[in-house]
Amino acid sequence: KRYKLCMLLIMCITMTYIAAGCGSKRDGLTITNVSYDPTREFYEEYNKVFADYYMAEYGKQIKVIQSHGGSGSQARSVVEGCNADVVTLALEHDISLIENTGLIDAGWKDEYDKDSSPYTSTIVFLVRKGNPLNISDWDDLIKDGVEVITPDPKSSGGACWNFLAALSYARDKYNSEDKQKEFLGKLYANVSVLDSGARGSTTTFVENKKGDVLIAWENEALTSLASYPDEYEIVTPSV
C-alpha cells in the first residue's frame, strides 16, 4: 500500500505584502521565494526556466532569490517579518499560518483545480550500501540498536510527513491505539539526532556518517544517491 504524500506547496502564492526592497526596477524584477529545505536544487533549475518564460512573456528580466529552511521555521520567519514575495512550503498548516496574518489572501487553496498540488513526493528510507541491517519496512526501525535520523516535526514539514507515514503504517498494523502509540514511541526512541530541517538530517546522515537509516523525501534521497551512488541505496517501505 503506497501513499503519494502531497507536498502542499503552492508554487506561486503571491504575498499581499510585497517586501521592502523587492519590486520593479528599470533592469527587471527581483523577488524572494521562501521555501523549505529539499527544494534548493529544484528551484535552482526551475528559476532558469521561469526567467526565460518571464522574459518571453513580459520582456523583462527577473531574478529569484532563494531562502530555504525547515518549513515551519520558514513560515514563522515570514510572519515575523522576513521579506517574501512567494512562499512554497511543505504543509497546508504553514501556509495557513501566514494567511491568518493577512499576508496571503483567503482562498489560496482554490488556485489549483480539484485541490491539487503542483508536485508530489513520497517517504523512503536511505540506508548504507548493501543495507547491512536488512531494513525493509517501518518495523525494522524500532528494533534495538537501529539508529534513525529524521528531522524535528516542530520545525520541519518533511518531518511531519515522516511522522504521518509512520502513523499510517502503525494504524494499518495495529487495531489498538495504545499499540500505535507504543510503535511511534519506540521509533522516536531510536532517533539519535532531530535536525531542524530535512536537509540538515541529510547532512547528518550522508556527510557526517551518523545513523543507520535516514527517513526522507524520495527526491531528497535521490539527490543523495546521485552524489554518492556507491555509498547509499533507497528502501521503499510499504507505506
Per-region residue spans from a language model:
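Internal, well-ordered alpha-helical segments in soluble enzyme and binding-protein domains
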Residues: 121, 134-137, 158-166, 201
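N-terminal segment of the mature folded domain
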Residues: 25-155
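Amphipathic alpha-helical segments that form well-ordered structural scaffolds
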Residues: 45, 49, 140, 165, ...
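Alpha-helix termination/capping residues and helix-transition junctions
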Residues: 16, 80-81, 208
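Ligand-binding pocket segment of bilobal, Venus flytrap-like solute-binding proteins
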Residues: 174-238
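Bilobed "Venus flytrap"/periplasmic-binding protein-like clamshell domains
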Residues: 40-45, 154-182
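Short, low-complexity disordered leader/linker segments with a strong preference
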Residues: 1-30, 52
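Hydrophobic, Leu/Ile/Phe/Ala-enriched alpha-helical segments that form helix-helix packing faces
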Residues: 50-54, 170, 225
